[in-house]
Amino acid sequence: MLYKSSLKNKKRIQKENLRHIAIIMDGNGRWAEKRGKIRTLGHKEGFKTARKIIKYAVENNIKILTLYVFSRENWRRPKLEITALMKLFFFALKSEIKNLNKYNIRLKIIGDTSPFNENLKNYIHKVEKQTFNNTGLILNIAANYSGRWDIIRGIKKIIKDVQKDVLDIDQIQERNFSQYLSTSELLPVDLVIRTGGEKRISNFLLWQIAYSELYFTDILWPDFNWRDFQHAIDYFFTRERRFGGISIS
């Protein structure tokens, strides 16, 4: 086996409660430009990297992997690049559905899919439905997503429930507010990884990462490999998660 998926590593991941990893996959365009290529080729290489990282997550018994594929702000990019990204998204869904089932992966999409074309929306629904009963890794894809959008959407759902007398306004607490977000059925995010050198969150899972550990690397996403992923996991192992409390040492 090429990857570091030893029993010791799996046990450490379980012991440290590393269950949900979220990745901001940044640097595809710059990777291509550095090589004198069009940005679209960088996204294609980024897809290849994503496949490898998903495999590594499966082999190491990570429960949930969230990938930031397309933000709501990404619509500001050139039209040709957006078209290429949508085509790549459709290709990825169509080409990987067999592997998702083979490796017992459940696909979940979060974000506003309404602007996507009908073929893409239908295929998203198809793949989510066909993998729904898979019990291994939950592959959570954030597409046309933003943290602010998620929070506002959650607030609107709460208002509707209050208006319908389903929920009393005094019952609204942090623990049940999370139930109104797109990640309601998922475990909290333990580790956020951002590639590409930037040190910001970029409107990603703003509510869900309140107590997440943050790992930033200068490595561009297409160059990010399983060893780099393991370095991020090893960094997580060094952290003492206090969740607002004090050190127990």
UniProtKB/Swiss-Prot annotation:
SUPFAM superfamilies, per database record: Undecaprenyl diphosphate synthase
A biological process term (GO) from this entry: polyprenol biosynthetic process
GO molecular function, one term: magnesium ion binding
UniProt KW keywords: Cell shape, Cell wall biogenesis/degradation, Magnesium, Metal-binding, Peptidoglycan synthesis, Transferase
Family as reported in the entry's similarity comment: Belongs to the UPP synthase family.
Subunit-level organization: Homodimer.
Descriptive protein name: Ditrans,polycis-undecaprenyl-diphosphate synthase ((2E,6E)-farnesyl-diphosphate specific)
Organism (species): Buchnera aphidicola subsp. Schizaphis graminum (strain Sg)
